[in-house]
Each structure stands twice: as C-alpha cells, then as structure tokens.
C-alpha cells in the first residue's frame, strides 16, 4: 500500500507539472486572442463568438469521446499525451494564419487536444481518496492557473517586441514538453478488475447527476467566453497593452481561489461552493450591466477569477462522486460534452446580442440563466 501511495503521488506530480506547462503555453496566447481575431484578422463579435463557441463545443465532443474510449479500452495515458501534442501543433497553425477563417482548422485541432481531460481527471479521481479528492482537483486547477500567470507575464513582457505570430509559435514549446512528460513518465495502471464493457445507459446514472447535468446546461448557455469581458474592457477605454494585465488579474485570482474552494468543498459540501460560484458570476453581470467605472471593471476580473476558481474544480469533483465507479471517465467526459455543446450557441448568441443590442445585452441574458440554474441547484441532493 505504501509503494502504491508513492506511485500515486508521483503520477499526480507529473500531471501537475504537465498541466502547469500546458497552461503556460496556452496563456501566452489567450490574453491577446480576442484582439488578434477582431483587430488584426478583422472578425466581428459574432465571428469571435463562433470561433470561441466552436472551440468549446469541440472540447466537449473530444472529452466525451475520449472518456468513453478510455473506459472501454481501459487506457488513459495515450489520450493525455496525444492531446497535449495536438494543442502544441495548433499554435504553430495560429501563427501562420492571415485571415480569421484560417483559424478554424487550427481551432479544431487545438480543441480536439482536449481528449486529454476526461482520462486525466479519471486518473486523478482514482488515485485520490474521499478525503483529498477535492483538494487534489483544486491543487491541479491552481497549478493550471499558476502556469497561466507565467504565460501571461511572458505575453506582457514580449508582446511589443515579438508581436502576435512569433508569440503564438513560442507558445507551442511548453506544451510539447507536457506531452513528453506524460509519454515518458506516466505508467499505465492495469485495471484490477477487468469487466466486459457493456456501455453506459441512463439507468446507470443517479437522478441527481441527471438533474445537475440539466441545470449545468442551462447555466452554460449563458457562460460565454472570457473574450467578451476583454473586448468589453477594451471598448470601455482600456488600452490594448493593458488588456493582458486584466487577463492576468483574472487568472491570478482563479489560481488563488481554486485550492481554497476545493478544500472548502471537502468540508462544507460541493453544492454550497457551487452556489457561491453562481453568485459571484451574477455579481460580475450586475456590475457590467450598470455601466461601471474602470476600477469596477478591474474588480470584476477578480470576481470572475474567483467564480472560475470555485466552479471548475468543484464541478469535476461533484460529477466524479455522482458517477458510477465503472463509468467515471465516461460521465466526466459526457458531462463536459453536454455543457460544452451549450457553449457553442452561448458565445454565438452573446456575439449576436452584442452586435444587435449593445455590449450589455449578453450579461442580461447570462444573469437570467444564472438565476434559473442557481435555483435548480438547491434541489440537487448534497454530496460531500
């Protein structure tokens, strides 16, 4: 048992560093992505919403497919390192794009790389205990965000010197390293009990899981991408050079709050922390609807980070606990697929509302859906 504990800790550390490096590469790009798409490649907000929504939808499909296949094949590792490799490859493609439609195939490759998520999360859930599962997911997310902070700092320092395209190419390097770490150092754990895979059905799922899936889908229809907040800030008067700083504030906030919220969910329950995350996002929407000052906009990026820090790791922990043991990766992947498929219309609808009714309109829409889904969450049975 002690030997297994050592091996589990080693596996977790490798995933932590792989996640850190991957997010470092990703977040060299993310702070300047919406401005690159709208200002350099001349896309409107609906096109930006389409690209971001397409990416989120593909994340969902690839996550679900990889979760299903990893359960069926009893293999996890291959999906993880291949996913990192595809993410690195896509960034080279971004650097070569000259008009916004060129981004579409590389966005597809990039987001298909999310085949790593459900198998990785299933491994983390398996090597964790009931007492530390929330903490482990929270720490993993914290390191994601910490890597992102370093990536954003690199972006801020070198953006004016190197420009968009060279930065995009450089962003591929740390993710290639992530792929190598997993490929070389993660040992595939053999299943102790090999069962004939019969496929997952709705009968296998707890009714609380089904209800949680429905309310999460409603919330996700209003959860448009971060790009809208950055463009909102730019249109409000922030200089282009300060936009990555706002993204840094958001990411640093998410990094600081992920682990505490993960630990808090271990103590007071997942549902309470998820309700808090909905309240934080509702507050962001209210502030931006009420035509804030620049200082209040900066504050909303802190709140947005806290919302993400509370939402993302606790969602995964909650789903992993509601899911049947033998279908854990399938449920994690299926959950991500459903809420991600909702993200495609979410960002596109937000773009259309922005273009047609003004930049506050998407926040009214999202606030309404947040209230509805938050009310529904009260009817989900508590799980520790």
Question: Regions from the language model: what does each represent?
Answer:
Residues 2-57, 209-246:
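Helix-loop boundary and gating motifs at the non-cytosolic
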Residues 78-92, 172, 272-287, 367:
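Structural signature of the two symmetry-related core transmembrane helices
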Residues 62-74, 159, 258-269, 354-355:
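Helix-to-loop junctions at the C-terminal end of transmembrane segments
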């Amino acid at each position: 048992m002690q030997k297994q504990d050592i091996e589990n800790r080693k596996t977790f550390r490798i995933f932590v560093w792989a996640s850190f490096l991957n997010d470092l590469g990703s977040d060299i790009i993310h702070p300047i992505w919406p401005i690159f798409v709208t200002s350099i490649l001349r896309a409107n907000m609906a096109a930006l919403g389409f690209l971001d929504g397409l990416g989120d939808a593909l994340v969902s499909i690839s996550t679900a497919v990889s979760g299903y296949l990893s359960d069926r094949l009893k293999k996890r590792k291959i999906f993880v390192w291949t996913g990192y490799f595809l993410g690195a490859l896509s960034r080279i493609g971004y650097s070569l794009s000259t008009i916004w439609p060129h981004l579409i195939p590389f966005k597809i490759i990039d987001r298909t790389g999310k085949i790593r998520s459900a198998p990785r999360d299933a491994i983390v859930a398996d090597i964790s205990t009931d007492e530390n599962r929330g903490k482990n997911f929270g720490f993993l997310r914290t390191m994601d965000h910490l890597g992102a902070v370093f990536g954003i700092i690199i972006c801020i320092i070198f953006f004016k010197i190197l420009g968009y395209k060279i930065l995009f190419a450089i962003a591929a390097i740390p993710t290639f390293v992530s792929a190598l770490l997993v490929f070389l150092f993660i040992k595939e754990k053999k299943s102790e009990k090999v069962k004939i895979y019969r496929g997952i059905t709705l009968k296998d799922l707890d009714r609380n899981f089904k209800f949680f899936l429905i309310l999460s889908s409603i919330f996700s229809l209003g959860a448009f991408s971060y790009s809208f907040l950055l463009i909102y800030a730019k249109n409000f008067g922030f200089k282009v050079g300060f936009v990555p700083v706002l993204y840094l504030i958001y990411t640093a906030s998410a990094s600081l709050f992920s682990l505490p919220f993960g630990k808090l969910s271990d103590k007071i329950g997942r549902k309470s922390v998820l309700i808090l995350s909905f309240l934080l996002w509702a507050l962001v929407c209210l502030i931006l609807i009420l035509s804030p000052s620049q200082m209040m906009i900066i504050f909303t990026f802190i709140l947005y980070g806290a919302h993400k820090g509370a939402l993302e790791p606790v969602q995964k922990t909650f789903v992993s606990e509601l899911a049947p043991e033998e279908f854990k990766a399938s449920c994690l992947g299926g959950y991500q697929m459903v809420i991600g498929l909702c993200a495609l219309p979410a960002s596109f609808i937000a773009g259309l509302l922005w273009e047609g009714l003004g930049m506050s309109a998407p926040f009214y829409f999202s606030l309404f859906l947040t209230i509805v889904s938050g009310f529904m969450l009260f009817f989900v049975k508590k799980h520790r």
